[in-house]
C-alpha cells in the first residue's frame, strides 16, 4: 500500500477479498496499550506491525528491504486479527458485527429447517494456526464451513471461540428460537425406528458369519 493512498491500513485490509468477515477496529481501541496486553509475545515484529496498522511512518531500513516489508505485512495481518478477536467482544465491536449479522454478511445456515437463518463467524480454537474460521448457526447451534473458498484460509483465532455467545448474552433479543421442525427419516411413508439400522446391521453380520458345526 503506497503512502499516497488516503485509505487507512485498517480499511484497506478489511476491504480485501476474503476479509469480508472482519469489521474495522477503532483506532482508539488499538492505541490503548491495555487492550494489547500480551500480544507482543505472540506476534513477531510487533512494534513495526503495530505502526503499520496505525499508518505510522515506517523505518527507512524497512522501506529499503522488500523482504522485511513482506514479513512486517504478515505480522500486521496477524496482529490485527488477534486485536479483532478481542475487539468484537466489546460493546462497540459487538454493535458492528451485529449490523453485519443482520445484513447476512456472514452467510446463511444451509440446514433446510433453519430457513435461511443468518450465521456468525466462530473459531474452533483461540490459538492462531490451529483452525480456520467456521460459521455458527444460533438456530440449530451447529457449525459449518463457509460456503465461499475465499474464506477457507481465514484463521478462526481472529474471531475466537466465544464471540457468538457473547453477542447473544449482550443482545438476547436477537437469539432465534430453536427450529420447530426436525427431519424424520421415512421409508414407504413410514417412520424408521431408531433401532432399525442397528438391527439390520446385526442381521447382516450374523448372515456373513460362518455357521459353526456342533459335534
From Swiss-Prot:
The modification Phosphoserine is found at residues 2-3, 8, 69, 209. The modification Phosphothreonine is found at residue 37. It comes from Homo sapiens (Human). This is Casein kinase II subunit beta. InterPro entries: Casein_kin_II_reg-sub_N, Casein_kinase_II_beta-like, Casein_kinase_II_reg-sub. Gene3D superfamilies: 2.20.25.20, protein kinase ck2 holoenzyme, chain C, domain 1 (1.10.1820.10). The gene is CSNK2B. Zn(2+) binds at residues 109, 114, 137, 140. It comes from the Eukaryota. Casein kinase II/CK2 is a tetramer composed of an alpha subunit, an alpha' subunit and two beta subunits. The beta subunit dimerization is mediated by zinc ions. Interacts with DYNLT2. Interacts with CD163. Also a component of a CK2-SPT16-SSRP1 complex composed of SSRP1, SUPT16H, CSNK2A1, CSNK2A2 and CSNK2B, the complex associating following UV irradiation. Interacts with MUSK; mediates phosphorylation of MUSK by CK2. Interacts with FGF1; this interaction is increased in the presence of FIBP, suggesting a possible cooperative interaction between CSNKB and FIBP in binding to FGF1. Its main location: nucleus. The lineage of its organism: Eukaryota, Metazoa, Chordata, Craniata, Vertebrata.
Amino acid at each position: 500500500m503506497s503512502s499516497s493512498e488516503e485509505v487507512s491500513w485498517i480499511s484497506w485490509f478489511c476491504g480485501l477479498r476474503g476479509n469480508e468477515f472482519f469489521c474495522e477496529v477503532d483506532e482508539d481501541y488499538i492505541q490503548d496499550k491495555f487492550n494489547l496486553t500480551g500480544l507482543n509475545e505472540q506476534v513477531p515484529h510487533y512494534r513495526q506491525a503495530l505502526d503499520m496498522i496505525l499508518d505510522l511512518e515506517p523505518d527507512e531500513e524497512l522501506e529499503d528491504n522488500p523482504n522485511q516489508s513482506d514479513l512486517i505485512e504478515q505480522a500486521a495481518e496477524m496482529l490485527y486479527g488477534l486485536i479483532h478477536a478481542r475487539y468484537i467482544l466489546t460493546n462497540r465491536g459487538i454493535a458492528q458485527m451485529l449490523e453485519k449479522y443482520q445484513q447476512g454478511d456472514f452467510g446463511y445456515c444451509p440446514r433446510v429447517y433453519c430457513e435461511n437463518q443468518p450465521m456468525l463467524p466462530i473459531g474452533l480454537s483461540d490459538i492462531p494456526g490451529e483452525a480456520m474460521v467456521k460459521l455458527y448457526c444460533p438456530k440449530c447451534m451447529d457449525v459449518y464451513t463457509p460456503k465461499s473458498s475465499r474464506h477457507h484460509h481465514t484463521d478462526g483465532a481472529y474471531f475466537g471461540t466465544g464471540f457468538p455467545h457473547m453477542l447473544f448474552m449482550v443482545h438476547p433479543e436477537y437469539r432465534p428460537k430453536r427450529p420447530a421442525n426436525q427431519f424424520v427419516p421415512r421409508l414407504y411413508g413410514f417412520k424408521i425406528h431408531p433401532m432399525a439400522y442397528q438391527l439390520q446391521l446385526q442381521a447382516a453380520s450374523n448372515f456373513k458369519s460362518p455357521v459353526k458345526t456342533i459335534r
